[in-house]
Amino acid sequence: MSSNLTSNEMSSTSAIVEPPEAVKGNERDKSTRRSTSQVVRPEKHEVENALEDQCSSSSLPKEAQYYAKLDKKLEGKDPRSQFYEAVRLSADIFAHKFEKAVCSRQTFEPTNSIIKVLNTAEEEMLHEKVVPLPVSSKLQYYLNRGRYDTIFDRDEQLQRTADPMADEPDHVEKRVTSILEQASREMEEGEVEPVFYDGSDEDQELPIDLGAMRNLQRTNKFAARSSRMAARRGGRPGYRGAFRGAARGAPSRRPAPAAEVAPETPVAAPMAPAAPAAPATPEAAPAAEVMDTSIATEMPQESAVDLSNVSAATEMDTSKEGEASRPTSEKKKKIRTTEMDRLMSMDLGPKDGGRVGELGHMWPESRRRPAAPLPETPAAQPRKSLPRRAAEKKKPEDSDAAEEQEVEMEVDNDASTSTPRNARGGRGGGNRRGSRRGQKRTSGGSGKLVEPKKEPVDEPAEKIPKRSEAAPEVPATATTKEAPPSTSSSPPDAPATPATPASSDSRDSPRKIRAMIFSLTGSPPESETPPVLQQEQVISTAAPTAGRHPNIIQQVPHINRIPPQPLRRLTAPQAPPASQPEEPPVQQTVPVVKVELASAPAPIVRDPQSTEPVPPAMPTLVENNHEATLILPPNKTSDYTRWNAQDLINWVRLLITNNVDSTIAIMVREEFDGETLACLVLDDDFRKEVPIPYGHYKKMKIYGTEVLNHYRTEKYQADLRKFHEELAAWKAQQR
């Protein structure tokens, strides 16, 4: 969002809400009558009516339309989607009312519905770690301008302290600020890409502009401090009072004396948003220009909005004298102490991998949940921790081997001056990548440098010989879990016990011993699977280690001896895969069942007609007083239900010879088919609905009655033949 766009938008907005001349005159009268002790404040209903009229004249829809849209969008959605929509629409309403209140110089009071939604959003943010991504671009626009805390005049705030609803807008501002700051922090940690809003679609759901949110805290601080410094210099801390002191070009940063304060400063002067952009004096112009460029370099191009208005405030905030000159009696008032205590007393627990530390701005160190884990016994420890322990024991061995390799590389590099040192493989102070590259550069134990391989796939193949040299006592067959039992009694396995430095510890559990065995043999800890899937392999692995570690004989077979039996009983009736040796006996059970069924006596095959069949009813024929012959369409039977529209037209052409085109046109328009023939014969009111000529209708009804009676007679004869067949079968079944 560029500065030109911002100034145009503000000028258009101010042109819409510019009060009439009568209102301007009243405001001038109010400004003359207003003093520091008495403030003329409009009624709440007057403010809301004025805002409603401004909403109707502005490009944004009314608040009622917003809530109607909210109810429509939240219909049938999950709670998280409802929360996103509520925050987005409430932020739109909040920013819209804020804009109208600032432009019309009126008191801004958000409605209770907006306060309720913002409270809900804050609680959701703190309790459920929800990031409200859809935030209004209008709200970001006013946050970036640095005018967020300059809504109310200082004297009006002092007069409204007795009102219980006086601090409500300030609370809402701080809640919105805290919500957006929390969302910005979580989005920065998640490295979310900032998406900038171009203003084309009003209903577009936007992620938070990270570039704008990084400057949120700084811009709010500018507005607060600029209002205080303007008050010390004699300017009013209103909309333009925050920048009035900088516009005067005062060379000193100290507060002005009381005698120099001008109490007759006009209050209700017409608002000109673009006026503070140009400095009043030539001395202030370079400073403002420099500050504008500094902010433009920090903020993204899309979020650097209205930098000319913020320049004066940033210039005043560069020195710390204003902060140092503030008396110690002015302390920041604590807001929502009861809510803060309630949140501090809650124990939310670590969520999403223990992200409680991100709530450091809410809980002190004394109230946080201790992050130290409880000591786990070996029995309650999950099997997934074995690879972690094995990996931890691998690290010192790998680092020692890497250091030895680096020493050899240094000696070789000093001896051979013709070979240059590779910058990528230099010593990195424990860098494992450099040590692994060093292993690739040396071929065997000769110490000669070779070119490093670019394929990372060959890296595990070169690590295996290095581990085998460090522990030559362990046989290579130990890496495979199907070693024969004869290897357990071989003499080279005996001296393998002193090779492990941690084997002398009497407190080592069988799980620790197995982890050390994995680290010596070189088998990756990730290849270990639960014992239910590898029962036979675990038992075969325990056999060769019987001579070295007697504890494994007591633990591993005892654990893995019982589970295979119920699994085999459950899987025996099922068809196993083709690779299992138990497939032939399972397939033999199928012919046995077939033999038993064949040897059993054949059941009596009964006809589906278990009761005596009923003869068909006599057909109901339509009385025809005229003698007529049966006329059918070409290649069709008397089954008129199977006639299509063309068959019916052909049948009519056989009956009627003169002026048949008019009747056929009516039939095509009304979409006649074979089913229509029954309606024409049986329904006497058919001609009232379809205007067919009477002569044609009479002839079609006579010959149609003949077709209908013939079809019913044939159907009855077919049903009668079927009845006789079923009756004969039933009688044979009863014998």
Swiss-Prot record:
GO biological process, one term: nematode larval development
Region of interest: RNA-binding: 224-503
Keyword Transcription found: yes
Location of the region described as Disordered in the Swiss-Prot/TrEMBL record: 1-59, 223-288, 300-534
Listed Basic and acidic residues bias regions: 317-355, 389-398, 450-470
Skewed-composition ranges (Acidic residues): 399-413
GO cellular component labels: nuclear body; nuclear speck
Region (SAM-like): 621-712
Domain of life of the source: Eukaryota
Compositionally biased intervals (Polar residues): 1-15, 520-534
Coiled-coil ranges from the UniProt annotation: none
Biased composition regions of type Low complexity, renumbered to the chain: 239-288, 471-504
Keywords: Chromatin regulator, Nucleus, Repressor, RNA-binding, Transcription, Transcription regulation, Ubl conjugation
Record's keyword annotation contains Transcription regulation: yes
Principal localisation: nucleus
Effect after changing P633S: In bx91; induces derepression of homeotic genes and affects sumoylation at 25 degrees Celsius
GO molecular function, one term: identical protein binding
Tissue spec. comment: Widely expressed. Weakly expressed in most somatic cells of 50-cell stage embryos. At 200 cell stage, it is strongly expressed. By comma stage, it is expressed in most somatic cells.
Compartment annotation: Nucleus
Function of the protein: Polycomb group (PcG) protein. PcG proteins act by forming multiprotein complexes, which are required to maintain the transcriptionally repressive state of homeotic genes throughout development. PcG proteins are not required to initiate repression, but to maintain it during later stages of development. Also required to repress expression of other genes and for localization of sor-1. Binds RNA.
Assembly notes: Homodimer. Interacts with ubc-9. Binds through its N-terminal region to the N-terminal region of sor-1.
Domain comment quoted from the record: The RNA-binding region is essential for the localization to subnuclear bodies and its function. The SAM-like domain, although only slightly related to the SAM domain, apparently displays a similar function. It is essential for homodimerization, the interaction with ubc-9, and the formation of subnuclear bodies.
This protein's name: Polycomb protein sop-2
Organism this protein belongs to: Caenorhabditis elegans
